[in-house]
Amino acid sequence: AWRFYTIPGPGEPGNDTWADDSWMTGGSATWVTGSYDPELNLIYWGTGNPGPDWNGDVRLGDNLYSDCVVALDADTGELVWYFQFTPHDVHDWDATQIPLLADTEYDGEQRKLMLWPNRNAWFYILDRETGEFLNGRPYARQSWAESLDENGRPRRVPDTFPSVEGTTVSPSIGGGSNWFSPSYSPLSDLVYVTAYDGETTYFIRDDEYIAGERFTGGGGTTPLPQDSYHAALRAISPQTGLTQWEYPIQPRSTAGVLSTAGEVVFGGTMDGYFYALNSSTGEELWYVNLGSRVHAGAMSYAVDGVQYVGIAAGNVFYTFALDD
C-alpha cells in the first residue's frame, strides 16, 4: 500500500543532514515493532542508528531519520512529524524501542503523550499529536549530554565521541535500556523500565563499506566487570520524568516489563528469576527461579474467567495463576 524510507534520498527533506553520499550506506533500520493510535490514525515507529555505528567522521550531520521516532499517516505513509533523540549518533544507541502511548495529565491538562525511556539514558515526554517535546530527564547513568534544550536537542559534553585510543562514556554500549519493552500503567500513572547504569570505552576505526559485510567503524569494551554496575527496574513519573522507586536487579536484566490491572508489575532477570512487584510501591510480592535466563517479556491472558501470566525462559514457556 505504501512505503516510508527512513533515510531521505536526494531532493527530499533531510537528505542534506548526510555528508556527500553517506546516506547510501546510512543504516537507520527499523527492527522493533512500533505503536498505533486509532484515534489519530498515526503509526509511531522507532529507527535505528546511522552507519557506520561509531565512526561519524564519514557521515557528518544529524543523519535523519536515524535515532528518531517517526509518526506516519496509517493510510498513506506520509510523514506527519518526527523527533530525533540522538542527532549524529556515534555510540550505537539508536531508537528501536516500543513507543509508549499514554492519555494522562500533563501540566494541568489532559494530553496524548508519548513516553520514551531511550537507550541514550534520557527519558522523553512528547505530545504524540504534534511531536512537541515537553520534558526530558536522565533515568539511567549518562555522561554524554549536559542537558536538553527547549526542543529536546542534547547539549553534548565535549570529548565524549569515540576515539582511536578509546573514550569511556555512559550509558554502556547496551544503553540505559534497550529493545526490551517498557510498560505504562494508567492505574498508577507510572512508566516501568528495565534500566542499567554502566559505561563503555568506545573506539573508532576506518572501515570500508563492502555490501553484505559488517560496517561498524569501531566498537566498544566494558572497562569494569559488568556485575560492578547497577541494574534496576525503575518506575518513572510521566509528568516529571523523575524516578519514583526502583527495584534493584543483580545481575542485569534484558527482559521486558508487564503491568496489569491488578496493580502488579512482572519482570525477569538474566539469572533466571521471574518476579512480581506492587506497581505503586515497588514492594516485592513473590519471585521464582525458572532455571534459565529470562529475556522475554511476560504476557497475560484469561481463559474461562481465570487470569494467567506467561513467561518464556530458555526453551520452556511457564504459566502462572492464582489459587482458587
Each predicted region: which residue ranges?
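Long, low-complexity segments enriched in small/aliphatic residues
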Residues: 35, 159, 165-200
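Active-site cores of enzymes that catalyze phosphoryl transfer or operate on phosphate-rich substrates
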Residues: 35-41, 47
